[in-house]
Amino acid sequence: MLAHAGYRRARTFFTPANAQSYDRLARSATFGRDMAWKREIVRAVGNANPVLELACGTGILSSMLASAGRHVVGLDLTFDYLRATQRKLELPLAQGTAEVLPYRDSSFGGMVSSYLAKYVDIDRLTDECWRVLRPGGVAVFHDFAYPSDPAVQGLWNLYFSILRLCGKFASSWKVVFEQLDDVIRESRWESRIQASLHSRGFTKICCNYHTFGTAVIVRAEKP
């Protein structure tokens, strides 16, 4: 049973109460950048097929991958988010965690995730990715990051202070708005996942920062 802090936090953040408003929030809270980052993920995974999306949520990225001709399989921790995906798309879905995947070895040509890495046990994630990917398979991870530029940090901190105030008027997102900035600051997931991927045997590992360093995409291949 998973009991680490990231798992508990994800359970607290993503609930039946906010599943229906997630898509709208993802667009507005990122000023539309969410779609731009997801387009980069689709480009990064290339022609890999089939593609497993971890933490598929309400199916935003899965829809984009399917439109690009990928055969998509989705997995998410929260049942109500999977139901939202099911209303949009016909694709195989499963409820579960990224650290214990319910799939056979070498099942996928690609694996993607968006907004997952800061919540998981990184080493268990990369172990499972290695197991379910075929040789030549591609893994793409995307999530928020704390910017390194002091000027951008100032704006970032101001934005999240405003977001905390907004939580007073959006009860289903209150906990997220109050805690997300601390989660992002403490995570530093991009450096940890690159080290873990390298240790596990992945090659061609690359890390690209986006939107003034506030988001990161890490890509790797299984030789």
Where are these regions (language model features)?
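Class I SAM-dependent methyltransferase SAM/SAH-binding core
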Residues: 52-100
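Conserved class I S-adenosyl-L-methionine
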Residues: 1-46, 60-61, 176-178
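A short glycine-rich, Lys/Arg-flanked "PGG" loop and its adjoining helix->strand segment in the class I
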Residues: 123-138
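C-terminal alpha-helical "lid/dimerization" subdomain adjacent to the S-adenosyl-L-methionine
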Residues: 6-9, 145-196
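Core SAM-dependent methyltransferase catalytic element
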Residues: 200-223
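A short SAM/SAH-binding and catalytic strip from SAM-dependent methyltransferases
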Residues: 110-123
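A short acidic, Gly/Pro-enriched loop at the edge of an enzyme's catalytic core
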Residues: 99-111
